[in-house]
């Protein structure tokens, strides 16, 4: 019997959606080097059935070239084929990243950061989402009942995310009705964004298989609880040491960290245009929303744009190792590559 498995070549666009083309499994090896063509006007797609004004029209094409290290294959369902996909680079002739490739943006930014500071950027994203069409009535926030009501979903999701190797750390109920949160372990550079992209798609797939829909929208209801995609990050030197903290300095932050925070606070309105890019994003942001109320920073302040997160350890070495910052504005309408 011919294997009917389809492998998806996927890429993250400007509105946080994963676009794709597919190839039969038998064609995969032949397509790995040069990928598949894609009309560049596709990058002007919104979440709705229209295109934003763009200079391309029907002209030009890029290649969506799969990144071998991002292979993800989830095979946990008896009644559905494996969920098999790769993340892609958008490339022009000669194997160079297209100027509008979101993955290329992040690669360039990380290279610039390392060139200027000599450091690597380490990050981890939190994923808040609502389970839509859950047939079980909502239980009180943060309770065991809330988790056990969706035990089949969380079991499948945990199994699938473990297969996806994204460093799953926590699965928990959240404050909103049918709201949950998943966190991934920190990773260096591109890997952090790739883990986030893969995690979201796997979570969506697990919900689909059970007749539900996982919504990462910043607000499902204008007056409801919001979903964020908070980014925890730190700076690492060539030896792997976390250099974000300097005990004894203000808030135990290193000079570089203080400068970085100052830059983020100063440019927060422009940063929000990239990290919270949709109209619905601004139903989530604001004072008393436990998201971002102000262009400010603070130690364990969940309404500041930048939250300083000291380590819970009392061991001096662990305190330095665990020290990190949290950018609280981002949501899932932005590509993790751009955040």
Segments the model singles out, each with a brief description of its role:
Residues 1, 10-14, 31, 191, ...:
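C-terminal accessory/tail domains of diverse enzymes
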Residues 1-170, 195, 339:
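ATP/Mg2+-dependent ligation/transfer catalytic cores
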Residues 13-15, 91-97, 146, 186-192, ...:
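A generic structural motif
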Residues 154-168, 182-189, 200, 204-214, ...:
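Accessory "access/gating" subregions that flank catalytic or transport cores
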Residues 193-201, 206-217, 225-235:
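Loop-centered beta-sheet repeat module
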């Amino acid at each position: 019997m011919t294997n009917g498995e389809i492998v998806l070549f996927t890429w993250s666009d400007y509105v946080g959606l994963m676009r794709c083309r597919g190839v039969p499994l038998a064609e995969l090896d032949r397509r790995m080097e040069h990928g598949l063509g894609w009309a560049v006007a596709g990058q002007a797609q919104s979440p709705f059935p229209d295109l934003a004004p763009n200079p391309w029209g029907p002209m030009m094409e890029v290649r969506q070239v799969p990144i071998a290290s991002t292979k993800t294959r989830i095979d946990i369902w008896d009644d559905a084929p494996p969920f098999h996909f790769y993340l892609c680079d958008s490339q022009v002739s000669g194997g160079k990243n297209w100027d509008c490739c979101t993955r290329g943006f992040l690669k360039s930014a990380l290279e610039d950061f390392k060139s200027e500071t000599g450091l690597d950027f380490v990050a981890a994203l939190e994923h808040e989402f609502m389970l839509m069409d859950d047939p079980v009535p909502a239980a009180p926030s943060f309770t065991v009942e809330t988790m056990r009501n969706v035990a089949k979903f969380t079991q499948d999701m945990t199994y699938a995310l473990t297969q996806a190797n994204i460093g799953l750390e926590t699965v928990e109920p959240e404050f909103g009705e049918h709201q949950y949160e998943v966190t991934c372990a920190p990773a260096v550079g591109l890997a952090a964004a790739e883990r986030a992209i893969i995690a979201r798609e796997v979570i969506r797939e697990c919900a689909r298989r059970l007749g539900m829909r996982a919504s990462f929208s910043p607000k499902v209801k204008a007056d409801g609880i919001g979903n964020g995609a908070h980014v925890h990050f730190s700076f690492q030197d060539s030896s792997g040491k976390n250099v974000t903290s300097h005990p004894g300095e203000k808030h135990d932050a290193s000079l570089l960290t203080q400068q970085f925070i100052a830059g983020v606070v100063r440019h927060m309105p422009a940063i929000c245009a990239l990290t919270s890019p949709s109209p619905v994003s601004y139903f989530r942001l604001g004072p008393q929303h436990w998201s971002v109320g102000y262009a400010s920073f603070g130690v364990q302040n969940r309404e500041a744009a930048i939250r300083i997160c000291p380590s819970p350890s009392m061991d001096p070495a662990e305190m330095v190792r665990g020290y990190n910052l949290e950018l609280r504005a981002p949501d899932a309408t932005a590509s993790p590559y751009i955040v």
